[in-house]
Amino acid sequence: MQIQILGSAAGGGFPQWNCNCRNCRGVRAGTLRAQPRTQSSIAISDEGEQWILCNASPDIRAQIEAFPALQPARKLRDTAIAGIVLLDSQIDHCTGLLTLREGCPHQVWCTEMVHQDLTTGFPLFNMLSHWNGGLQHRLIELDAKPFSIPACPGLRINAIALRSSAPPYSPHRGNPHPGDNIGLFIEDLRTGGTLFYAPGLGQVDEQLLGWMRRADCLLVDGTLWRDDEMRVCEVGDKLGSEMGHLCQSGPGGMIELLDGLPTARKILIHINNTNPILDLDSPERAELDAHGIEVAFDGMSIVL
């Protein structure tokens, strides 16, 4: 299984266009040793020819340009994107579908709750129906058998319901439903390699831990270092837990969780622009290094 990190930042990217926090100001000025990042999305493939997008970032055009395998140029109009899986209906995970409209029709796998959001509160399916067949919904059923995407038959995918939040625009924002957010457990049937992918992870129960223990690689929510980070940085008033994100530090945080898992590789993705782990010289980044936890970056490649 080939995994390409197209984007590794949370919504807004890094630096965020309107943010002058320590991190954003420092990376613009060149005084902070950090790598700019686009908004989170990954691509996966069994053979490296056809690729499945997991989430469609607002930065998808730049991400395609940065990863030539997605534009193989075999004919006048071409793409290696053969399917799209949405893990939620957050704006930073689905707005890229608008940029991909010239390539419609696209097969889009998502849960019924995500499909509802994207036909009501943010009706992308409705809007794009006017472009050559638009988005063709393929239902992801929860607690069902694993599924495969025809273009990459060597990958078997399990969808796992997560405890997190629907987007702010969702009609049921304050009333969470199973399927608002999912994680993916992906297995390569040829190599046996396994990936657990959950860029938005708010709570972890024993059932979810069972999936995480089975994975060779964990690619999980790295949004915030501390739960009150937005307040401390004076850029917002919400806690990470209120937004559906488990912070890294402290009792019950992501570091403690990952320390208890046997996985060979543990990687954080969906990093918010305020998170001190973006600073390569920060004590927080050193703490991750000491625990054997990696931080995803744009252009990172993983083979399982």
Swiss-Prot record:
<dbReference type="GO" id="GO:0018189">
    <property type="term" value="P:pyrroloquinoline quinone biosynthetic process"/>
</dbReference>
<dbReference type="Pfam" id="PF12706">
    <property type="entry name" value="Lactamase_B_2"/>
</dbReference>
<comment type="pathway">
    <text>Cofactor biosynthesis; pyrroloquinoline quinone biosynthesis.</text>
</comment>
<dbReference type="InterPro" id="IPR001279">
    <property type="entry name" value="Metallo-B-lactamas"/>
</dbReference>
<protein>
    <recommendedName>
        <fullName>Coenzyme PQQ synthesis protein B</fullName>
    </recommendedName>
</protein>
<dbReference type="InterPro" id="IPR011842">
    <property type="entry name" value="PQQ_synth_PqqB"/>
</dbReference>
<comment type="function">
    <text>May be involved in the transport of PQQ or its precursor to the periplasm.</text>
</comment>
<dbReference type="InterPro" id="IPR036866">
    <property type="entry name" value="RibonucZ/Hydroxyglut_hydro"/>
</dbReference>
<keyword id="KW-0884">PQQ biosynthesis</keyword>
<keyword id="KW-0813">Transport</keyword>
<comment type="similarity">
    <text>Belongs to the PqqB family.</text>
</comment>
